[in-house]
Amino acid sequence: MGFIKKLVIVICLFVFYRCDSDITQNKKLSDIESLQLKASFVDLKNKKVDLTSFKGKKVIINHWATWCSPCIKEMPGMIKAQQVLKDYNYTFLLVSDENISKISKFKNDKKYDFNFLKSVGSNETFGIYSLPTSYIFNEKGIKIETIVGTVVWDSEKMINKLKAF
């Protein structure tokens, strides 16, 4: 019985910690500039990418990993959404903290047409403890939504929501 009580306490502490970290995360990552200050990114040629260069565009940053099956599951829908939203000024950036060769191999194997980036640092740098996690930024670079978990990006509801931003 003592083990079960300890387990319940540990689970409760984890839940309270997660609630606190989400609140902190939302305050710290309010715009693309604050995200750029927290971390740096490189493309698959190891060239530094400045996120502030995307100001003027709506940006979806999706944090994922090659080992994350929910992340991979949502990618076909994301490809369709990217095509549907091409006239709505959206840029999709898929960010992983894995090494460039692993990301490149995944991109080449799957033949996905995304802007794949490597974050220099871990997902914890962003306050991300669950994958996939996506941030949606408006044209001014202000974060308008954080989505934790799998998204059906090509659903009518999501497409309409993204068109409305």
Predicted segment positions?
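Short pre-active-site segment immediately N-terminal to redox-active cysteine/selenocysteine motifs
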Residues: 57-59, 63-67, 130
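Conserved redox-active cysteine motifs that mediate thiol-disulfide chemistry
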Residues: 63-80
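A conserved nucleotide-sugar
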Residues: 86-92
